[in-house]
Each structure stands twice: as C-alpha cells, then as structure tokens.
C-alpha cells in the first residue's frame, strides 16, 4: 500500500497513513527521482570531482600497458578520397586521362570505369617528418608531425551503410555494439555525472544507418552513445516540462519546502527498496534516471563555451561561418574529455541527398571535397594543437576515419574523363594521433595508382584491436556472452599494428 505525501520518512523508517491513488503516486515519484539525483549532485562538497564508474567487463582491463585513457573519433561520412588527401600518387598525374592499364576490370559500385584522374590538389611534404599531405588540408599539414597515417586500409563493402557499420562495429550488419560502447563497457567512466560515450552528429543530418552507429547492440543499454546537439538545447527533454500555471517562486512540486520533502521521501523509498529487493535491473533503471538528473547541471556547464578565450574560439574557427559548426564540436569534445568522458565521436557529414552533404564525391570531386574540407580542416588542427598545449594529447587517442576511399579513375563511361570518383573498398587512408604512437609516419601502402592495398594491409579488426591495445585492452579478452556466443569487437580476427606503437 502506498504512503501518503504527508508521511515523510525519517531515518529510513515508514509508517502507514491514508492511501493515495497509485497513478498519483507513480507520477509524483517519477518527479522525485529527478529531484533526488539533483539533490545528490548539489550536496557534494565543493571541489569534489564526480565519482568514477567502474568497468563491468568479466575480465576487466588493463590487460596491456595503458598508453591512452580516452578517445576522440572524427568520422568523415561518405568516403573521403585518400588520393586527394593523404596518399600521394605521382603516377596518376603522369597517366591522367589514360585508360586503366592491364586486363583486369575492377568491380565498382556503379559499374563505370572512366579514365585515370589525377588528384585535384597539390601534395607537399610537411613538418620535420616530411609527411605527404595535399593542399586540401593545409591546416592539418601544419600538425603533420602529430599524425600516424595508415595508407593500407581495406573494407568489406562499397555500400555506405554496411561499410559505415563495419567501421564502427567491425560488422556489416546492424545489431552489434560500436567501438565507443565496447570501450565504455571495458573501462567504465571517469565521471558519474556525464555519459561515458558522447556523440556529436553533424547538424546537417545523421550518417548512413542513422543512430545505429552509436548503438550498444547487445551490450546493456547504458553503454549506448548519448547524442548532444552542438547548438541550441543539447539534449531533448533533459529538463522536466513545467506547467504554465505554476506561480512565480514555486516549482512543479509546489513550494520549495514541499520539493525538499519529496526529495527526502523518495530517497528513503529507494534505500528501503534496495535493502529488501536488490534487483540489478531496477537498480540500473534508477541509475539511469539519476544520471539524467545529474546531467541537468553538468550538461549546461560543459556545453557553455563562453568561458573559452577569444583566441581559442578563433583558433577552432568559431568566428567563421564555414568552420563554426565543426569547430564547436571539436572544442566541445575537448571539454567533455576534461570532465571525464571516455569516448567522444564527431560525425562530419550527413546521409544522402542532393546537393550532397558529405564526402561522397561522385559528380564533382573538387567542388565536393573542397566544401567538406573547409568545414573540418582548421578545427581538427586546432584540436590537436589544443590537446598538445594542455598536456592532454599524451594520454588521448584521436582517430580520423572514413568508410572507404575513392577510385583512381573517374566515375564515367569508358574513355571519358569525368569529374567524380566512385567508392573504393580495396585501399584507403585513415590516421591516428596521440599517446603511444610513432608520430609523423605512414604505415602500409596502396599500389602505384592508389587502387588496392598492397603493403601491410589493415582491416577494421586490426584497426580496432590496435585502438583497444592502446587503451590497455586485449581485444581477445574483452568479451560479452550473447546468444550462446562469446562476442568480441574484433570477432575472431585482428592483430595489433605493433610497428606504429612507440
């Protein structure tokens, strides 16, 4: 039988008074959960950092030396051309406008094999390392000595949606946990008032496959990514709706004294229930409500960029229309890491449409990639500099990936030199930066025209195994039992790329 509102518990004991309606009790107690959690957050001593959330893995890390403890993942939606960015192929200029040599007929997504096409941007060597980067990314060229470029990536699909799933989960089908979810499951979180895994989608739209790209899959729901908006209200329905007829100076609970009574009463109910019925599912649900309530204070604080200096905001490009959106995401990513978030994922580009809002340069590579690079180049370089200046890059891993590359020949009819490139899953480039890596280097190679990976080929399981290894996680030991199978991010594959580790 429920208790009446007037029966506020004292020291965890209760006494039965007049019954109230179940519907009224449930409505009232739901509001109380939020109030209780906020009260818990506000009651902390000044200067006391939020508590950590431990790993729930059966075989918790570290299994290996810990080189990094947090990750920023920059994902370029649509298929960034390696040939126009990080994989210099001088022979393409020599053979520009000629047919593909040899008798092999490549398999392409749209089935069109035009003439060979040179890159649209000049390549230059940058930094002390002499790393080749094209003029598509002049700002990234200025931080070339921070980059570890992998030029021999391969994927198993040339279709955007399954290829994007594979880049994030290791599998082409949906229903599997993404990298950020596995990391949260394995390492826990360094704060209990923000999620372990935060996603910053492109305001123009979601990536191919939508929100599945930050799904927990079969892992517990608390390990899914939590999407923030980078402008406006960061999260829908984070704050409870307030009735228009609530008098000034009062809350939806009534007077401030009534709200305090509610907090105390619900806290006592929770304690009593956990002592008598310690059910994990219910405790997990209560924890999720509590996290949401804590985020009512932590999210506005971490997303408020007004405390950043004008110089910092300008460096990230917040003062330019072309760079402001992604610049804000990059700056917010750094702030989230500072508050204890483990994994922040930024998507550059939305899904399909016309005009294109991603890196899918089928029709006009020069126009398409120039537009997208302008949005991200300056902010990403600023992020690397900022992390380095703050001493954070030594224990932070930055990933810059895409689902596949582009073909060295034009997407056009035979003997025609078109302006676009088709999808290429046989060879493309990604890069890493941060702690535990050899900087200013490239690993692996595609063939002379950039069509196929031919030297030290890297698969997504290899890439994911290396990321987990840098975090101190043995990818063969991070498992979750599901439907009779011990599942892993890397399935039964994957080798750590030892040659890129410092």
Feature roles, as predicted:
Residues 3-502:
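Ligand-binding pockets and gating/stacking loops
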